[in-house]
């Protein structure tokens, strides 16, 4: 099933987490109780038409530790956005953080698939080292140690990074072909 995790550090707190590592750590009890073997997490500012079964099959076929959905195009203006370089087998070989927004790159859509046990280990290790950035401290620093692969979002996909892109995305969703 799908679960939406809270964006705030605690019920009475109105401040956001300082980073994805802190957010995941705060929800680790919920994640630990989950009976699912895999975790797929995604940011809420993406509009993507993707077959999750195809993503799961790809992840399994590659024997990947982590699979990240990416898009080839102009990089959105987001903090801690990742851009990738791949080998011929789509394995991530280099991660650049927050590339210039006017460049054409293979950028992360922040849709990430991995085993629950790996996520728990990576988050606990990051917390013990006082790390906050999932992208920099977990993904970028483990490119050589883990089998991290990219899965290209080839269908309709957008990242909302401004009021204008929010408007543009809504206008594009009026086209029935984009909703198939």
PLM region spans:
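Conserved N-terminal catalytic core of the sugar/cofactor nucleotidyltransferase
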Residues: 1-47, 52-54
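A short acidic, often aromatic-flanked loop/helix-cap motif at beta-alpha or helix-coil junctions
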Residues: 10-15, 75, 101, 157-158
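Conserved core of the sugar-phosphate nucleotidyltransferase
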Residues: 35, 47-120
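A generic structural signal for alpha->beta connector loops
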Residues: 1, 63, 145-147
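Catalytic-core segments of class I nucleotidyltransferases/pyrophosphorylases
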Residues: 40, 56, 91-179
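Short, conserved catalytic or adaptor-binding loops enriched in Gly and charged residues
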Residues: 1-3, 85-87, 140-143
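Short, surface-exposed amphipathic charged segments that create phosphate/polyanion-binding patches used
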Residues: 15-22, 81-85, 164-170
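Conserved beta-strand termini and adjacent loop/short-helix elements that scaffold enzyme active sites
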Residues: 5-7, 69, 151-153
């Amino acid at each position: 099933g799908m679960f939406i995790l809270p964006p705030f550090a605690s019920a009475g707190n109105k401040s956001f987490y300082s980073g994805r590592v802190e957010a995941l750590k705060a929800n680790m009890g919920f994640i630990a109780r989950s009976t699912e073997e895999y975790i797929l997490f995604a940011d809420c500012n993406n509009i993507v038409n993707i077959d999750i079964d195809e993503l799961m099959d790809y992840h399994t076929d590659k024997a990947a530790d982590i699979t990240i959905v990416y898009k080839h195009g102009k990089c959105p203006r987001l903090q801690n956005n990742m851009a990738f370089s791949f080998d011929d087998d789509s394995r991530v070989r280099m991660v650049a953080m927050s590339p210039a927004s006017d460049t054409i790159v293979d950028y992360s859509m922040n849709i990430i698939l991995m085993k629950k046990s790996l996520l728990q280990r990576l988050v606990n290790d990051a917390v013990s080292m006082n790390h906050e950035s999932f992208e920099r401290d977990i993904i970028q620093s483990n490119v050589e140690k883990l089998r991290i692969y990219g899965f290209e979002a080839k269908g309709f996909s957008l990242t909302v990074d401004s009021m204008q892109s929010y408007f543009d995305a809504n206008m594009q969703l009026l086209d029935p072909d984009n909703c198939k």
